[in-house]
UniProtKB/Swiss-Prot annotation:
Protein's UniProt name: 4-hydroxy-3-methylbut-2-enyl diphosphate reductase
Enzyme Commission no: 1.17.7.4
Chain residues that bind (2E)-4-hydroxy-3-methylbut-2-enyl diphosphate: 41, 74, 124, 168, 226-228, 270
Keywords, ordered alphabetically: 4Fe-4S, Iron, Iron-sulfur, Isoprene biosynthesis, Metal-binding, Oxidoreductase
Cited InterPro entries: LytB/IspH
Function, in words: Catalyzes the conversion of 1-hydroxy-2-methyl-2-(E)-butenyl 4-diphosphate (HMBPP) into a mixture of isopentenyl diphosphate (IPP) and dimethylallyl diphosphate (DMAPP). Acts in the terminal step of the DOXP/MEP pathway for isoprenoid precursor biosynthesis.
Catalytic activity from the UniProt record: isopentenyl diphosphate + 2 oxidized [2Fe-2S]-[ferredoxin] + H2O = (2E)-4-hydroxy-3-methylbut-2-enyl diphosphate + 2 reduced [2Fe-2S]-[ferredoxin] + 2 H(+); dimethylallyl diphosphate + 2 oxidized [2Fe-2S]-[ferredoxin] + H2O = (2E)-4-hydroxy-3-methylbut-2-enyl diphosphate + 2 reduced [2Fe-2S]-[ferredoxin] + 2 H(+)
Catalytic residues, chain numbering: 126
Residues binding isopentenyl diphosphate: 41, 74, 124, 226-228, 270
Keyword Transcription: no
């Protein structure tokens, strides 16, 4: 068996920044540091931060007064921000700047009085945060669609004053079909100046397409609640390559590799490289020989830290 590694894989700039915000807050202010929702969707990362003093909660009513709160990389609604401000909580915002970009688009559409359609997965925290940016007090509305069937059933108030945005971690192929359906049904619909699906999601999906065409089985290192990790698994399966979403080496099963010559490995944007190395080591122990990494698109993007948490230059 030969191992091929996707490139790029694993942490993106938004995840790096979110984790570093929690780490720096713990260093500067000491525990406990409260984090609304898992800062990123990865069990290993969350457990590591919890061991260092981060306290993960789902709602602000679980947060005592006079503590530091961090908003997760997925973003929050205006109502959550307003509640934190009302209570005077000290907040550090780890929302990915590319999610914030989508939030600003929704706010702009709301101010313009345009109805808005969000393409995304119901119940995902990013979707909840984005939906919560829209102010319907001016008579507008925001709608959520997941697929072409939802578009077929959707009724809006004014199809001539309409715009769409998307969740940042969707399948590019699936989303393009939904956008085509929206444009067909609502010819006047507007959209973002630039694709809302983030660069890291696009790059990792492109890498999986290449990897799935060259391997007999694909492993995606990522947690079950990670949207972008699930999309990677689905993409490989759609190409006819058996694919498995795993938290780490402990999830591997011998029977997946019977008669297999090429094993592809990638990792979702929330999964650290240490988990990938653990998978590689386990496969080597089971007889895998050789390891290559695909040529990939370089990722040089970084996002700035909140001023109060920046490391001072020596």
């Amino acid at each position: 068996m030969h191992i091929k590694l996707a490139n790029p894989r694993g942490f993106c700039a938004g995840v790096d920044r979110a984790i570093e915000i929690v780490n720096r807050a713990l260093e500067v202010f000491g525990p406990p540091i409260y984090v609304r929702h898992e800062v990123v969707h990865n069990k290993f990362v969350v457990e590591d931060l919890r061991a260092r003093g981060a306290v993960f909660v789902e709602e602000l009513d679980q947060v005592p007064d006079d503590v530091i709160v961090i908003f997760s990389a997925h973003g929050v609604s205006k109502a959550v921000r307003d509640e934190a401000a009302r209570r005077g909580l000290k907040v550090f915002d780890a929302t990915c700047p590319l999610v914030t970009k989508v939030h600003m688009e929704v706010v702009r559409y709301s101010r313009e009085g345009r109805e808005c359609i969000l393409i995304g997965h119901e119940g995902h925290p990013e979707v909840e945060g984005t939906m919560g940016q829209y102010d319907a007090s001016n008579g507008g509305a925001i709608y959520l669609v997941e697929d072409e069937a939802d578009v077929a059933e959707l009724q809006v108030r004014n199809p001539d004053n309409l715009a769409f945005v998307t969740q940042t971690t969707l399948s590019m192929d699936d989303t393009s079909k939904v956008i085509d359906a929206l444009r067909s049904k609502f010819p006047a619909i507007g959209g973002p100046r630039k694709d809302d699906i983030c660069y890291a999601t696009q790059n990792r999906q492109d890498a999986v397409k290449q990897l799935a065409s060259e391997c007999d089985v694909l492993l995606v290192v990522g947690s079950p609640n990670s949207s972008n990790s699930n999309r990677l698994r689905e993409l490989a399966e759609r190409m006819g390559t058996p694919a498995y979403l795993i938290d780490g080496a402990e999830d591997l099963k011998h029977e997946w590799f019977e008669g297999v010559k090429g094993i592809g490995i990638t990792a979702g944007a929330s999964a650290p490289e240490v988990l990938v190395r653990g998978v590689v080591e386990q496969l080597r122990a089971w007889g895998a020989a050789g390891e290559t990494e695909l040529d990939g698109r370089p990722e040089n993007i970084t996002f700035s830290m909140p001023k109060e948490l920046r490391v001072k230059a020596l």
